[in-house]
Amino acid sequence: MEDEKIIELYFERKESAITETALKYGNYLYKIAYNILLNNEDSEESVNDTYLGAWNAVPPEKPRIFSAFLSKITRYISLNKWRSKKTEKRGSGEVDLAFEEIEECVPSNNSVFEEIETKELAKMISDFLKKLPETERVIFIRRYYYFDSVSDICKKFGFSKSKTSTLLCRTRKKILSFLEKEGVLDERR
């Protein structure tokens, strides 16, 4: 079913909206949640919470890009669940690793999470990413937004682990340099 029709079902408050959303986007949303949580049960719960979040948000919200709207809800719910579990016990995984890698670009003594949620910084980084070549931008987003593992990215793009890691490292350095030039970070050199 087309996204416009699914959104129409939400506006009509028909429960089939959730069924259609699950049929079309369930696997996609589960992958996002699982990349963050690394747990089947928690991932399924995040996806179900996403459906509830969409139900509560539409209407009045009318998403332009439904998949992006849903992925944002799933990511937010999954990261909150991950944070609460992390405070309960120290864990490791792609989310921890991705945050460690990107932490050098975040400008403050505050936690990475607080800084990433800062709208102004997010907009600056988003604008910067739009200027990158498509492959570089997509790889960066797959790693640091969707938390794909480096090996998954290698498979998807047909690159070696070394090439992918180097590309990510160079992109992080470009962002760091950009943020320094914009005055967001003190120059570290």
Give the ranges of each region predicted by the language model:
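Amphipathic alpha-helical segment used for protein-protein interaction
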Residues: E12-E15, P107-I141, D148, K155, ...
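Short, charged helix-capping/linker segments at alpha-helix termini
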Residues: F11-E20, Y30-D49, K161, V184-E187
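Arg/Lys-rich amphipathic alpha helix in sigma70-family domain 2
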Residues: R75-E94
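DNA-recognition helix of helix-turn-helix
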Residues: I65, L79, I125-S126, E136, ...
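Sigma70-family region 2
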Residues: F11-E12, N48-F66, K85-K86
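Short helix-capping/turn signature of helix-turn-helix
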Residues: K24-G26, I36, I141-D148
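Short, leucine-enriched amphipathic alpha-helices that occur as contiguous helical runs
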Residues: D3, G26, S71, T118, ...
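Residue-level preference for hydrophobic side chains embedded in well-ordered alpha helices
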Residues: T21, Y25, L29, T50, ...
